[in-house]
Structure formats: structure tokens, C-alpha cells
Design a protein with these regions (language model features):
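Gly/Ser-rich oxyanion-binding loop with an adjacent helix/lid
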Residues: 1-88, 221-225
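C-terminal nucleotide
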Residues: 71-226
Length: 226
């Protein structure tokens, strides 16, 4: 039997964890544990997309399958570049804690699917398939015209992507340099951008339930700038 401490439906990638363990078991039974972890992640993503009907990306599956702290470049979705980031949080006298806010992501498939769909809508405006292919300066130079598509949330989500991709590189650089204070600053900036621009903290269709928002507010009150 399989047992897990991953909370179901709480946004902690419980489905990716399940897919990974099944893939790893099959790798052990029939392939002497030789199946590449990234391939296991891709198989898990396919299963979730096709058989479960959730249009998830590959990030959660890679995190579960490869393990540790990783940096991923999805430019070539068939061959994502995955690098492990060697860091020991205890060295910096920090622990990563998971707070159970009692929220659920179980019925948010449509909300989740809207994020890449809206970003692709912005990319299509510039005749590109993916937003990462759009020149950032060209986007901001034409932001008034882009708003004419009638979806300001898509515009805000595009702003998040442009800044977040740069933040990821800076976060990895900060960890490699041992600058944990800079890493924390960048992580907080990432969270703030997710809240304001990506808007993935609560569902606009259910504004009365904001358990993650409450968790963030209380964490900020307890931790302050620490």
C-alpha cells in the first residue's frame, strides 16, 4: 500500500506526488529504476491532462520526481532543462514550513486553466504562441493597445510572467552566492506579484473564501521582515 503526508486538494501537488510514485514503482518493477525522473514527470503530466482532464503544466511533476530544490527551463517542453540547486536551509538557520489553511484546490480546474490561456491570448496578440517569446519592451510599449482585447487580468498576468522569469534566475544566483537575505527578498517579491498580478491566491468566483489570503496575512504578522 501507499501512504503519504501530502495534504489532498490543498495545492501541494498531491496528484503529481501520486503520479510520481506510480511511475517510480513501474520503473523499479520493469526497468531496474533506470527511467529518467523527467520522463516519469512527463508521463504523469500526460496522465493528468488526458485521463484526469486537468490541463496542468510540468512543474509540479518535475518537483516531485526529480526532488530537492530545482530550477527548470520549459523553453523546449519535450526536453525541459532541469538543474538541482544545492542549498541547505538549515545552514542559514531557516526551515521551510507548510501551513494547512484548510483551503481546497480540488474544484478550481477552470480557474487554473485560465492562467495559461490568458497568457497565450496576450502572446497571440503579438503573433507568438507563448508569452516568453514576446519582447518585454514591445509589450510595455503597446500595453494600452493590448488592453483593448478586453481582459485586464490577462495583461496583469503577463506583467507577472515577465518579472517572475527574471526573479527565478536572481533567486538561483542568490542561493549559489550564499545570499539568503536577497533570496528571501526575491521570494517575497514573487509572492506579492502572484497575489497582485498573477491573482492565483483566491478565486474571483468565490471571494468569501480566502483561507490562503488569511494564512499569508497571519504569516506576515508573525514573521514581519524576518
Amino acid at each position: 500500500f501507499i501512504t503519504s503526508d501530502v495534504i489532498m486538494g490543498a495545492g501541494l501537488s498531491s496528484s503529481a506526488a501520486f503520479e510520481t510514485i506510480i511511475g517510480t514503482i513501474l520503473s523499479g518493477l520493469y526497468n531496474d529504476m533506470t527511467v529518467d525522473p523527467v520522463l516519469i514527470a512527463q508521463i504523469g503530466q500526460y496522465a493528468e491532462n488526458v485521463y484526469f482532464g486537468k490541463p496542468c503544466g510540468l512543474m509540479d511533476q518535475c518537483a516531485s520526481s526529480v526532488g530537492s530544490l530545482i530550477n527548470i527551463d520549459f523553453k523546449d517542453i519535450d526536453k525541459p532543462v532541469v538543474r538541482k540547486v544545492d542549498v541547505d536551509f538549515s545552514k542559514f538557520e531557516h526551515s521551510l514550513c507548510i501551513v494547512d489553511t484548510k483551503g481546497s484546490h480540488a474544484d478550481l480546474t477552470d480557474e487554473y486553466a485560465a492562467i495559461p490561456a490568458e497568457m497565450k491570448k496576450i502572446a497571440n496578440y503579438f503573433n507568438k504562441e507563448f508569452l516568453r517569446e514576446v519582447d518585454e519592451q514591445e509589450f510595455f510599449d503597446n500595453i494600452a493597445k493590448v488592453r483593448e482585447i478586453g481582459n485586464d487580468r490577462a495583461v496583469l498576468r503577463a506583467i507577472h510572467l515577465f518579472t517572475e522569469n527574471k526573479r527565478v534566475d536572481l533567486q538561483v544566483a542568490a542561493l549559489n552566492a550564499g545570499d539568503f537575505d536577497e533570496f528571501k527578498r526575491l521570494i517575497k517579491a514573487s509572492g506579492d506579484s502572484s497575489y497582485k498580478f498573477l491573482q492565483n491566491v483566491y478565486a474571483n468566483s468565490d471571494v468569501f473564501n480566502q483561507s490562503v489570503s488569511i494564512g499569508l496575512a497571519m504569516s506576515e504578522k508573525i514573521l514581519g521582515d524576518n
